[in-house]
């Protein structure tokens, strides 16, 4: 039986009217297409990174997916329903975490916030206890469950936000900048939780972030949006392999030499007997470069770096700006 998509957007568009003052009295209006003819299918169990530069259309798309904004064009269905017409029904089936907004009660202990959310989402006491027992262990919440939310550190609060979004066992989890401002330990805890959630329970994850390490550690698929249009969509390794056409080789030679000149490479720097070369793999291969160096001189040691995900994404942004 064919799987139905969790998110199905067809020709999705959102147009905003921007008013600008022209002189003391007159105003001019400009129409801005924030999202333009976007087609997106996300299937159950996928963990998808949704990335793009500021103003690319990420937040607008997320707001249409969650029923906050009305599309100007196209159709959107989430879990088989219209998010705008059946927003309350959708709310009980998805979890949402926005790094800059809270769904917790600031004056209440964290545990009390979870209890209130149980009633709002109409979760049975037994199901809630089972979920919370797992989440408390996964996110290491036990030491601050009785602490008022306003007294929590940013990292503690974000772990609490993630638990709050997951306590009702959503089929789809949407996260917008969940690790913004967090220390390394808290970031690692959030990423580990998202991986385990996806792998253990098959929860579909849609993650937007500017921290590309989040994408690299959590997501198997990347969708890149720019100027409201999807410019890349595919498995993360494929994206890196296809667009990461440059690698860096470091060679340590038996003697100090002038910069090596090898076809298909650019000499980056020399430090004593070590030299770094950037390899353009559209022109040559790492094996051919190493063989060419070996014909010129003796090699003591070498290392070869894989394409950097940050560089790949910057290349995508630059090509579509």
Task: Please state what every model-predicted region is.
Residues 191-280:
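ABC transporter nucleotide-binding domain
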Residues 107, 148-152:
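Conserved ABC ATPase signature
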Residues 115, 119, 127-144:
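Conserved ABC ATPase "signature" region
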Residues 169:
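Conserved catalytic motifs of ABC-family nucleotide-binding domains
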């Amino acid at each position: 039986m064919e799987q139905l998509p969790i998110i199905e957007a067809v020709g999705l568009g959102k147009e905003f009217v921007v008013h600008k003052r022209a002189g003391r009295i007159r105003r001019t209006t400009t129409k801005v297409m924030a999202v333009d003819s976007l087609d997106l299918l996300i299937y159950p169990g996928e963990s998808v990174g949704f990335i793009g530069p500021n103003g690319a259309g990420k937040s607008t798309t997320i707001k249409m997916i969650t029923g906050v904004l009305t599309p100007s064009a196209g159709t959107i269905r989430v879990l088989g329903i219209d998010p705008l017409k059946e927003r309350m029904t959708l709310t009980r089936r998805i979890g949402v975490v926005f790094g800059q907004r809270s769904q917790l009660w600031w004056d209440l202990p964290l545990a009390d916030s979870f209890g209130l959310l149980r009633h709002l989402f109409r979760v049975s006491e037994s199901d809630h206890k089972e979920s919370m027992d797992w989440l408390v262990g996964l996110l290491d919440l036990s030491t601050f469950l009785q602490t008022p939310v306003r007294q929590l550190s940013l990292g503690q609060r974000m772990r609490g936000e993630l638990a709050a979004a997951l306590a009702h066992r959503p089929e789809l989890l949407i996260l917008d900048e969940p690790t913004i401002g967090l220390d390394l330990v808290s970031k690692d805890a959030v990423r580990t939780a998202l991986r385990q959630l996806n792998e253990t329970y098959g929860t579909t994850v849609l993650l937007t972030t500017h921290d590309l390490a989040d994408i690299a550690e959590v997501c198997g698929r990347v969708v890149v949006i720019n100027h409201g249009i999807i410019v890349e969509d595919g498995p993360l390794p494929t994206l890196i392999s296809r667009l990461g056409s440059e690698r860096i080789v470091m060679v340590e030679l038996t003697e100090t030499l002038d910069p090596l000149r090898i076809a298909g490479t650019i000499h980056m720097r020399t430090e004593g007997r070590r030299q770094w070369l950037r390899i353009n793999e559209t022109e040559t291969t790492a094996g051919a470069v190493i063989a060419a160096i070996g014909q010129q001189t003796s090699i003591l040691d070498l290392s070869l770096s894989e394409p950097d995900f940050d560089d790949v994404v910057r290349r995508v942004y630059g090509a579509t700006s």
